[in-house]
A protein has these predicted regions:
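A general sequence property marking short-to-moderate contiguous segments
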Residues: 1, 60, 141-142
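Short linear S-[DN]-x-LW-Φ motif typified by the pepsin-like aspartic protease active-site region
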Residues: 1-56, 77-79, 85, 97, ...
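Residues that act as N-cap/strand-start positions at coil-to-secondary-structure junctions
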Residues: 2, 9-11, 45-48, 72, ...
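Structural recognition of beta-strand segments within beta-rich domains
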Residues: 18-19, 69-72, 78-79, 87-89, ...
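Extracellular beta-sheet/turn segments enriched in Thr/Pro/Gly and aliphatic residues
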Residues: 58-67, 187-188
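Right-handed parallel beta-helix
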Residues: 87-128
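Short, surface-exposed interaction patches in beta-rich subdomains
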Residues: 116-201
Length: 201
């Protein structure tokens, strides 16, 4: 079975997407609307879906969850105004992100994530059993990374120094960027098991 996804909303301060396993593309654009398109596929019972806009908080929540004992997958394309804050929960699959300039928070499991052209002032990432590569077009003020059985590579603009704090239980942290104690730009790293590379350029 399948179902077409089509959600169009006015601008929201934050868009929160809880996706079913599958492919997610998120694009920051010079648009005044939030637009989610795509398709859900499933076997058994239809996925549980919800779209809710909290106008007071300015939060648009988009949720797609497989029903019990009914495997499902999704293919999503989310286009947002480029300064919109984005929160993504991705249980498995492949994620491609480009052009975002608002705060970004990602929680993912068994996912391959690629992000380019980021101008986000802050990013929080928690990945288990997956991989992420991210390239920043502007230096983030705050970056927090948590890895469990995961690998990640972040490329940050040259010429900016960072205050870096880290806790590595099992794994490896490669620091190829300038470290400056007390810098306005800071990076917090927690690696329970995995590898993280912080590189310039």
């Amino acid at each position: 079975m399948s179902h077409v996804i089509s959600v169009v909303s006015g601008p929201a301060a934050t868009v929160e997407l809880s996706a079913a396993p599958g492919q997610v593309t998120i694009v920051g654009s010079a648009t005044g609307l939030v637009r989610l398109t795509g398709q859900l596929h499933w076997t058994g019972h239809a996925p549980i879906t919800a779209s809710r806009l909290n106008r007071v908080a300015g939060v648009l929540q988009l949720s797609y969850r497989c029903a019990a004992a009914s495997p499902c997958t999704g293919n999503y394309r989310l286009v947002v105004p480029w300064r919109t804050a984005v929160v993504l929960h991705q249980p498995a699959g492949h994620v491609v992100i480009s052009g975002l300039a608002g705060p970004l928070r990602i929680t993912a499991h068994s996912a391959d994530i690629s992000a380019t052209g980021l101008r986000t002032p802050s990013m929080q990432v928690a990945i288990s059993s997956g991989h992420m590569s991210a390239t920043f077009a502007a230096a983030p003020r705050h970056l927090a990374v948590s890895l469990t059985s995961a690998q990640a590579t972040f490329r940050l603009p040259a010429g900016t120094g960072y205050a870096i704090s880290s806790r590595v239980t099992a794994g490896y942290l490669q620091v190829g960027i300038p470290q400056v104690a007390g810098a306005a730009h800071n990076i917090a790293v927690r690696i329970d098991s995995g590898e993280l590379a912080l590189l310039s350029g």
